[in-house]
Structures are given as C-alpha cells and as structure tokens.
Amino acid sequence: MKRSISVDSSSPKNVFNPETPNGFDDSVYLNFTSMHSIQPILSRIRELAAITIPKERVPRLCWFKQLLELQAPPEMQRNELPFSVYLISGNAGSGKSTCIQTLNEAIDCIITGSTRVAAQNVHAKLSTAYASRPINTIFHEFGFRGNHIQAQLGRYAYNWTTTPPSIEDLQKRDIVYYWEVLIDITKRVFQMGDDGRGGTSTFKTLWAIERLLNKPTGSMSGTAFIACGSLPAFTRSNVIVIDEAGLLGRHILTAVVYCWWLLNAIYQSPQYINGRKPVIVCVGSPTQTDSLESHFQHDMQRSHVTPSENILTYIICNQTLRQYTNISHNWAIFINNKRCQEDDFGNLLKTLEYGLPITEAHARLVDTFVVPASYINNPANLPGWTRLYSSHKEVSAYMSKLHAHLKLSKNDHFSVFALPTYTFIRLTAFDEYRKLTGQPGLSVEHWIRANSGRLHNYSQSRDHDMGTVKYETHSNRDLIVARTDITYVLNSLVVVTTRLRKLVIGFSGTFQSFAKVLRDDSFVKARGETSIEYAYRFLSNLIFGGLINFYNFLLNKNLHPDKVSLAYKRLAALTLELLSGTNKAPLHEAAVNGAGAGIDCDGAATSADKAFCFTKAPESKVTASIPEDPDDVIFTALNDEVIDLVYCQYEFSYPKSSNEVHAQFLLMKAIYDGRYAILAELFESSFTTAPFSAYVDNVNFNGSELLIGNVRGGLLSLALQTDTYTLLGYTFAPVPVFVEELTRKKLYRETTEMLYALHVPLMVLQDQHGFVSIVNANVCEFTESIEDAELAMATTVDYGLSSKLAMTIARSQGLSLEKVAICFTADKLRLNSVYVAMSRTVSSRFLKMNLNPLRERYEKSAEISDHILAALRDPNVHVVY
C-alpha cells in the first residue's frame, strides 16, 4: 500500500541547528520522505511531456487558416488535436495544492487556475517558499478576452453519426459549440503573425542564427523568452496545470488543446517542430464541483443557468476519452483531509466526498450539529460566524435582517452605512439593442432589473441589501444614470469580487504585530521583485511616523513611574547611539515634524504637547513654571529625556538609489526593534499588546468616513479575492494614481466627465496583517453581443465588495471560513453541495446547520462516485494517503 506525507515547502532553509543533538533539525527529514509518493507523479508527467508524435499527426497551420473561411462551422473538416491528460483528484485539504507546488518547482510547466480565485490561491501557495511569477486563469492563457464574456455559446451544433464517437468527433463538437470565441482568437493570432506583433518571428530568427553559427537545432530556443517577454506562455512549455478544473465545462479542455496547437504553429516553437503534444494536468475534485453555463435569452430578458458536464467528470466517465488518455495509468488520488484534525468528522467528509455508504453513526454525528433555523437566522446569535444559504434570495434576506438588527442595537463598532453605486446606460446603444432584439417597448428600468447579474458580479448584485433604483436622464450627454445605495457593515469582514488597485496608507494593530511584520519580511515578499524598493521606502516612512507611539505608550498613568523613567533614559540612549553621524533636523522643526508624525493609539493625529509630553514628564522638577518660548520648552523636555530624539537627530528623506533605500529601512527597523526590546522587557504584555498605528499622513475617523490630508508616500498594490479584509469605512480623499487609471480606461467621454463630477467615495479596508488601504472603485464596461454586432451598452461603478457574513454555498467553495452556520433547503439537497458546505470549517466545534441532510432525501452523484471507487481498487491508479 502506498503512503505519502504531503510536501511541506515551508521547511527551514538553514538546516543546520547546533542546539539539536546531531546538529540538524529532524523535521527536514520528514519533509524529504514525502517525495516518495509525489515522485511517481512527476516522473509520469515528464514521460507524457517527452512523447513525440509522427509529423503526419501534427496539426498543420493551413487547417487553422481554413477555419477562418468557413461559412457554416458544422462543415469544418474533422482533425485530431493530439494531447495527453494527467488527473490529480482528492478531497478538500488532501494535498493537491502542495502537489502543484512540487510540480512548479520540479518541472517547467504553466500553472493556471480555473477562476481568478483559484489562480490567486495557487499563487499564495507557491509564494510561501519562493517568489512566484503571477498565476493567470486558464482563460487568460489560451487567449480569452473581455469581449468574449457575452459570446453566444452553442449557437452552432455538431452531431456525430457513429457510436461511440471518435476523439475527432468529440473535439469537433466542442470547437463548434465554442465557435464564436475560438474563431475570434484564431483571427487575432493570425493578425499578429501577419503584422509581426507579439514576437511571432522570435523563434524563426533564432533558427536562422543557429544555422549561421552551426549550432544544433533548438539549442538557442531557450533564450527566446529572454529576447521577447511577450511570447505566449503556451509556447514555453507543453505541461499545463489547471487548478479547480472541476469548475470548467468540458468544452474548455478542447479549447485549451486547440489554442496550444494554434499558438505553437503560428510561432513555430521548438516543441511544435519536435512534435511534442500538450499535457493537460487537471487538478480538482469531481464530486464537489459543478460546472454552470449561463445563456441569456434576449427576447425574454431572462438568464438561463444550467449545470453542465465538467472537465473532470468528462475525462473520467466518457469511454472514448478514458481510452484515448489511458486514464488509469495517468491518475493520482489524494484521500486524506489534513485540514481536519478530528477522526470522526474527517471520516464523515471522506464518506460524503467519495459516495461511500452512509451509516447510522454518520447520521448521529451530524445530528449533533443541528439547531433550529430561527436560531441561525437570528443575527443576535453566533456573532462572527458565516451563514451559508442555498440561494442568493436567502442571503439578501439575511443581510437585510442583520442591518435592521444593527440599526436597532445602535452598536457603534458594527454600525451600518450606505454608499451609492451607478450604472451609466448609453441611449443610442440601448435604442440599437431594442431594434436588434425586436423589442421597441423595452424600458431601461426593466433591462436594468433583468441584467443586474450580468452588469455587476452576479453574487454581488444578488446578495447585497440594496435600496431603490433612481434614474436620471441626461439627453445632452446621451446617458441615463441609474443610482442605488448599498448598505455595508462597519468593521465587518469582506472580500473583493475582482482584482482592484489599492493604495496602502498605513498600519493599525499592536506593537507586537508590527514587529512581526518587520521580522518575517512577509509584507516585502508579497510585493514581488519589481516593487521591493517601494515596499522598503513605505515601511521606512511608516516606522518614522510611528516611533512616537512608544512615547505615547509611556503616558499611561497605570505604568510604574520608576520603569517609565528608566524607559525614557534607555530610549534616549538607544536613539543617540543609532543616529550618531546622521543628518540632524533643526530643533524647532523637529518638534513640529515629530508632532505631525505622531499618531495616538486611536489613529488620530497627536498634538505637539501630547506627542512630546513637555509638561507631563514623570518626576519632573519643573512643575511651578513652564517656559513660554518654544525652544525653552523643547530644551526643558530634553533635560527630562521625554522628547523623542529621532525627530531632532534625523531628517527623513526619500532616497532614490537601492542602497540608500535599504540602508534607511535597516536604520528605521533597528530603532523600532531596539525600542520594542526595551519596553517589552520593562512592561511585558501590557506593552506588546498595546495598540500601534502609523499612517503616511495625519488621519481621523469621523464615524465611518476616514479623513486624511495627503496620500503621498502610499504603496500601490492589488486587493486579491483570496484575502479577507475588515471594512473600516470610506473616504473622499483624492488619490491621483486612481484618477490616472480611470483616464487610461478610455471610457465614453461623457461617462468619464460625470464620474469626475460625482466624486465617488473609495472604500478603506484593513488586511489580515493590519495594513490599511484605500481601494479603487470597480469600474466596468458592459458590451452586449447581438448576432454579429457588439454594443457598448453600459458602464457600472461599484465597490467590488462582498460580505463574508453570509453567502451562497456555491460561492463558498475554495474558501476557509472557520465558523459556519448552514441553512439547507430540504427539497433541493445535493450531496456534493452538502460536502462543500460542511468542509468549509476545519473543526466540527464550529459547525451548525438547520437540518440533518443525511436524514432527508438528497440527490447523489452516483455515476462519478462509482468510477472513483473503482479507481481506488485499480492497481494502476496512484493513490496518495
């Protein structure tokens, strides 16, 4: 029986440890032993990648060119597009992502995700050990673009005449089904080849140089990506890894293979010349995921969402594909839930995952999680838990109930506020849409209601507590503006629904948490190689502005006076020692700058007298009379050692060279670490857990609105869908870089002008590390595809946020939610949805549900479960425990 311990890439880089008996850390051997079960996967994928096919089986470029001339797609000539598949499946937390990390480190491959969330999850995993290149979705890699979102899938159909169908039949069916997207990609790729754009001639140039230098063919092809950074990733490798592949429809498999051959044929890459074929490594769980397809019926103004066969189920269950891919020899199954530390709960999840027989013991275990639905739906119960529902309607109803509860309770910490969102509809485009769809009487109001899920992120538009839509017509601008208010909860947990720009402006946490940030360099690592200097400069700015917090802490009257006096002396000595020889600031200017940099524990700007405590020195002998001259006040404070000498001894600047930036950061870090050590020794946890906050400028929170004078010195970054944020409020502060980004979008001119005039507020979020950011608004264009016409119908402006207080079970997939309360719908129970909902938590102690689904009637994925159980008994399938 094969056993495996998943690869732990977080093993210490410095293996030698003199404190252990043999001088080495024993844990490193455990990490090495894990390779014996992962190694066969690597070896098999390498074998598949090295296979070459005869020249007559290599798809010719002329075949792709013929497709551009077709009038009726079903008449296209059948042609095999050779490929291999390796399948990696398993239940939640079994080690699939760790296996992807090993593949990335051991094989030159293209790592992708089925969705942006999946891609960002993979990137987060890969970045734990080494700096990782950005991970894109599989759609981005094969050439899918924004104008394809509204493409009409299934407009054409192909029906084979033989049973069972051949692999050529299956591929032709998928190409015809996905015709509008694939033919548009084909046109664009051929145009690039004709124009010489995108480095299409790079490989041909290298072939010519090789012949001139009498080098072996292909010996210089490895330099292609150095010479031209715009080469498609598909021309670099023939191993393509897709995480969460179960979310993709079956036609995407053929789309990936089609585009791989198309791009390599156009570029004449070495792998095309040598007859290599693509190896699609599909990672995911076929029993817990569903692929959904949406078709919008324009005549009915209704979106029709239907489940479709996903890639994993397609590969496993289709007999033709099973034989073509030899799936039994190219399948690895991970069957251990390492996230769950409870044996009974872990066994229950495995039973649900693989469709094993459900026993009375399983049902009794689930009985312990059941509470009344009214208990879950009462916002006063289970604070901090995430509610999961079957439908968006239930989510929206709970959010409305929660907001009403918070308004009545008058909770200052979790107060509610509303912000406007806008939709700008082009009148001329809307009139053209009505003509093309034969609906002259269609109103804008009805169109907005019917298309809200397409205009905005679907779950975002359905889950929010939204107000009444108000319409304004601006005929002179050719626009109708629809405005609606969305209610948010202050200090609640949220996620972003798309990648948004953010400007990091500060930090709010504790002295200990900020020391941890500086110690492990996680903040700098997350910036990537191109932004490290900016990260160091930003941290230096924060440290310099936040050093006054150490002196603010010493103002606490509950501290022992002797220890406070000693702290002042040691802080002054440390500062003089570290800053000797640095540029000094003028004394009076130092006081002003220091006061401006000071931030008290509540995040508000500290006044000069409070920041330096000129009149509140412990055991001060100067109590009867206070000098009125500012310089006399400062010298008095110097004598009492209560002034922060950093602002006297050091003039903060913004260095330009890398060495100066890094040197400044090391100096600021040394001051912070030194002060932290002094006060931690004297005051222990009362200091380390005390609030610490620092911003690039003075800030103040007026209810839910953040007021800040200047954002200069902020750090530009991305808000990712995989991160969890705390909603701190909103701000109207101008952010120049966001204004520039709006200008670059090249929206309809009148829409842009109205956006400037409306002055849309920006959200303020805090990430899990404590960094506070201003997040750009989510501005999206909506283009409708009708027949062969593309209409720029609307522009939407919202905040791209979705609450973690409640969501649908479908949207929770891939998220770790810790504390979960589930409301199932008794008449629509599916076992895979039950598994997804229950597996979001790592402990059964934090799981509640309104009913026991194992005692109700439910739908079971019998066919796929039978195939997986058969695979577990198949000696050719590689099983990893």
UniProtKB/Swiss-Prot annotation:
Record EC number = 3.6.4.-
The Gene Ontology terms for molecular function here are: ATP binding; helicase activity; hydrolase activity
Sorted keywords for this record are: ATP-binding, DNA replication, Helicase, Host nucleus, Hydrolase, Nucleotide-binding
List the GO terms this entry assigns under cellular component, sorted alphabetically.
host cell nucleus
First-tier enzyme category under EC: hydrolase
Classify the source by domain of life. Viruses
Any single Pfam family the record assigns to this protein: Herpes_Helicase
Q: Give yes or no: UniProt keyword Cytoplasm.
A: no
UniProt record, GO biological process: DNA replication
Location of this chain's protein in the cell = Host nucleus
Residues binding ATP, per UniProt? 90-97
Q: Does the keyword Hydrolase apply?
A: yes
Family membership, please give it: Belongs to the herpesviridae helicase family.
Quote the function comment for this protein.
Component of the helicase/primase complex. Unwinds the DNA at the replication forks and generates single-stranded DNA for both leading and lagging strand synthesis. The primase synthesizes short RNA primers on the lagging strand that the polymerase elongates using dNTPs. Possesses helicase-like motifs and therefore may act as the helicase subunit of the complex.
| SUBUNIT field | Associates with the primase and the primase-associated factor to form the helicase-primase complex.
Q: By what name is this protein known?
A: DNA replication helicase
High-level lineage: Viruses, Duplodnaviria, Heunggongvirae, Peploviricota, Herviviricetes
Q: Which gene encodes it?
A: HELI
